[in-house]
């Protein structure tokens, strides 16, 4: 995949919007954790919401850092983290659903949870691999 070059204004807008996402995520996290602690299974709910928040914030933090950095070697590495963190964000989003809603559904919850997280880990790792042009594997 070709590296898209953003102009200065686009980079500034990306940095600002993702930085705002971090702040809003922290605020929302407080309310989500508060609500989770009132759940019938508070330990499960708080753990699942924490995983969700970690995935979401990893995505916003890595993206903010990537878009806010100057061109160079560091930016190239941060781009890989930015792309890899999307997989963690997706898996974190599935976690509350699979372990709070589906956990007692005859193995479906744990099965989907394992599949999603193994896929996310594979995607994260592939984000750091240099693939041949026109490879069937891309992140």
Regions inferred by a protein language model and the residue ranges of each:
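Multi-pass alpha-helical transmembrane bundles in non-GPCR membrane proteins
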Residues: 1-139
């Amino acid at each position: 995949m070709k590296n898209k070059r953003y102009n200065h204004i686009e980079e500034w807008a990306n940095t600002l919007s993702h930085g705002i996402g971090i702040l809003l995520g922290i605020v929302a996290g407080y309310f989500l954790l508060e609500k989770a602690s009132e759940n019938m299974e508070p330990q499960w709910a708080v753990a699942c919401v924490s995983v969700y928040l970690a995935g979401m914030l990893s995505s916003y933090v890595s993206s903010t850092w990537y878009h806010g950095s100057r061109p160079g070697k560091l930016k190239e590495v941060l781009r890989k983290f930015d792309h890899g963190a999307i997989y963690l964000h997706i898996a974190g989003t599935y976690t509350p659903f699979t372990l709070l809603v589906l956990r007692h559904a005859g193995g479906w919850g744990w099965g989907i949870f394992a599949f999603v997280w193994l896929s996310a880990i594979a995607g994260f790792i592939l984000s750091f691999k240099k693939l041949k042009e026109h490879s069937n594997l891309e992140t």
